[in-house]
C-alpha cells in the first residue's frame, strides 16, 4: 500500500463542500424531511491514480485514532480549465485534479 499521505493530498474546502458537511451535523428537528443526512460526508483532493478502495484505506489509517469507518467513496476528475495570467497577456491552463467525496458511517466523523 502507498503512504496514506501520498494518496490523500488535502481537505477540499469550498462553500459547497462545507454545506455538504453541515448537512450531517444538525438533528433535523423542525426542518423539512430530507434536509439532513445521517451519514457525514467530507471532500478531499486525492492523487490522480488513487482508486476508491485505496482512498478508503488511506483515510481509515490517517484517522485511526478516531476509529472512523468509510461507507462509500465517490470520485470526480476535474479537467484543466483555460486561464489567463499577467493581465490577460499569457494564456495557460489551471491544473487538473481528482477529488473524492467520502461518506462515513453514522456516528463516525473526523470533525
Swiss-Prot record:
Biological process, per Gene Ontology: translation
Keyword Repeat found: no
Domain of life: Bacteria
Keyword line: Ribonucleoprotein, Ribosomal protein, RNA-binding, rRNA-binding
Gene Ontology CC terms: ribonucleoprotein complex; ribosome
UniProt cross-references to Gene3D superfamilies, sorted A to Z: 3.30.70.330
GO MF term (any one): rRNA binding
Function field: One of the early assembly proteins it binds 23S rRNA. One of the proteins that surrounds the polypeptide exit tunnel on the outside of the ribosome. Forms the main docking site for trigger factor binding to the ribosome.
Similarity annotation: Belongs to the universal ribosomal protein uL23 family.
Assembly notes: Part of the 50S ribosomal subunit. Contacts protein L29, and trigger factor when it is bound to the ribosome.
Protein name per Swiss-Prot or TrEMBL: Large ribosomal subunit protein uL23
Lineage of origin: Bacteria, Pseudomonadati, Chlamydiota, Chlamydiia, Chlamydiales
Amino acid at each position: 500500500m502507498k503512504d496514506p499521505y501520498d494518496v490523500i493530498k488535502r481537505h477540499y474546502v469550498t462553500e459547497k463542500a462545507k454545506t455538504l458537511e453541515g448537512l450531517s451535523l444538525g438533528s433535523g428537528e423542525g426542518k423539512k424531511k430530507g434536509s439532513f443526512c445521517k451519514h457525514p460526508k467530507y471532500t478531499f483532493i486525492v492523487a490522480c491514480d488513487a482508486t476508491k478502495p485505496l482512498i478508503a484505506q488511506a483515510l481509515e489509517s490517517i484517522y485511526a485514532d478516531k476509529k472512523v469507518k468509510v461507507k462509500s467513496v465517490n470520485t470526480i476528475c476535474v479537467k484543466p480549465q483555460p486561464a489567463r495570467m499577467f493581465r490577460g497577456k499569457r494564456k495557460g491552463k489551471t491544473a487538473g485534479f481528482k477529488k473524492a467525496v467520502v461518506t462515513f458511517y453514522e456516528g463516525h466523523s473526523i470533525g
